[in-house]
Amino acid sequence: MENTVKPQPRRAVVAAAAGFAAAAAYAIVGALQILVWNPLAAVPGATLGQIRAEMARADQPLTANWVLAWGMSGIVLATVVLLVTIIRMNSRVGPVVAAYLVLLVFAAPGHFFAGFGPGMSLADTFLVSGADHAPWGMLLYVVSAASLLALIVLIIRAGRSATAHAVRHG
């Protein structure tokens, strides 16, 4: 009997494109959450320029370096997976989807660490909580949790499929 798990290059490339879009959107929304939306929500009525100026006066600048490094690293990793999928014309959909799910799962702790310094700077300057004030950070964590659940389901299904294939083909 022939192997029933065949490469599906077109479907794999479509999955990679969707995964790239999801990972890039996560990085962009995460950076905007940390650098724009959260400061504006933490200090209602102030402009971003006023918030940044007050933070700089308090020697608690809202620096973007780590945030942008986090976002760009996610986009670079997503690009690598996309390019490998396009170049390898024998990619299967499952591993491509799994790669992007892993990126989305690990984006959450990265987002937390990238946002920790700016959040504490906001807290120290304006005497507010260092936690997220805008809702988008929580949405990103929900996306990561859903990605973890999807990854677990994907792994279980792949294991069951491999076991069934081994039983059928000895």
Regions found by a protein language model. Give the residues of each.
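Hydrophobic transmembrane helix segments
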Residues: A21-A69
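Hydrophobic alpha-helical transmembrane segments of polytopic
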Residues: A15-A23, G71, P95, A99-V102, ...
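Alpha-helical transmembrane segments of multi-pass integral membrane proteins
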Residues: A108-G170
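Cytoplasmic juxtamembrane regions at transmembrane-helix boundaries
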Residues: E2-V14, V80-F106, S161-G170
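Cytosolic juxtamembrane helix and N-cap/initiation of the first transmembrane helix
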Residues: M1-L40, L154-T163, G170
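Aromatic-anchored segments of alpha-helical transmembrane domains
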Residues: A23-I28, V102-F112
